[in-house]
């Protein structure tokens, strides 16, 4: 069974965190970063339970979050192993472990609080936006979700960067945006303007995100297909 820990927030309430695997080597420093991210985003009075799963076979920096749109008190987070180390170490892993089986050893001194904070803040922003503005992908056609999620990602990382918090850089996000949306019919005409608008936006809602996608798709365009809220 995953181990449950309670971390007190600034107001004295306890954030319960369950880890899987329970003996994850970086659990204690990672949990401090996670609790800080919850407080930084003003979610300490909203989220009470977090279930955190580590994909130890994935050396990349993929992460995603799931929650019940009608109850924001609990959420599930999944993190690939690369979220806990620096980008430099991830690149080193890709060279030295590309043809090896198993996973690289992970020691406490390798933990990157900034890298993990970037992942935590980004994923928790998805829940925060649903809680405050009703932004969620579940009510949209499956074929639109990957594109809508990337528009949402741009908006999130733009806000985090303006606050000086750990986040994907503008250049990195722009490259992911291009890879995800380049096949939409009007990307070459409006893609750059849509990216700038999302990156600079402070307040958006589900209708605005949908409108940006429709602008990229054009009258009869289709967005690429996939799922979930991913970084």
Task: Label every model-predicted segment.
Residues 99-119:
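Short pre-active-site segment immediately N-terminal to the catalytic Zn-binding motif
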Residues 2-96, 159, 163-166:
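Auxiliary, metal-adjacent structural segments of Zn-dependent hydrolase domains
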Residues 132, 140-177:
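Post-HExxH zinc-binding segment in Zn-dependent metallohydrolases
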Residues 89-91, 98-101, 108, 138:
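N-terminal, positively charged nucleic-acid-binding surface of large information/translation enzymes
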Residues 86-90, 129, 133-138:
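Short acidic/His/Gly/Ser-rich catalytic and metal-binding motifs that mark active-site loops
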Residues 25-29, 112-116, 120, 148:
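Short amphipathic alpha-helical segments
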């Amino acid at each position: 069974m995953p181990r449950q820990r309670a971390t007190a927030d600034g107001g004295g309430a306890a954030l319960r965190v369950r880890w899987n695997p329970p003996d994850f080597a970086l659990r204690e420093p990672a949990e401090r970063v996670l609790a800080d991210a919850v407080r930084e985003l003003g979610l300490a009075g909203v989220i009470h339970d977090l279930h955190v799963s580590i994909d130890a076979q994935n050396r990349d920096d993929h992460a995603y979050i799931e929650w019940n749109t009608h109850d924001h008190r609990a959420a599930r987070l999944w993190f690939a192993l690369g979220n806990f180390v620096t980008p430099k170490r991830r690149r080193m892993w890709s060279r030295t472990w590309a043809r090896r089986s198993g996973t690289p050893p992970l020691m406490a001194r390798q933990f990157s609080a900034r890298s993990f904070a970037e992942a935590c803040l980004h994923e928790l922003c998805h829940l925060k936006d649903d809680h405050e503005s009703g932004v969620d992908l579940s009510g949209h056609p499956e074929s639109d979700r990957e594109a809508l999620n990337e528009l949402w990602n741009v908006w999130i990382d733009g806000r985090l960067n303006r606050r000086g918090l750990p986040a994907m850089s503008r250049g990195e996000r722009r490259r992911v945006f291009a890879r995800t949306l380049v096949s939409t019919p009007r990307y070459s005409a409006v893609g750059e303007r849509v990216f700038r608008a999302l990156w600079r936006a402070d307040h958006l809602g589900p209708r605005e995100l949908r409108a940006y996608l429709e602008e990229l798709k054009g009258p009869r365009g289709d967005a690429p297909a996939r799922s979930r809220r991913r970084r």
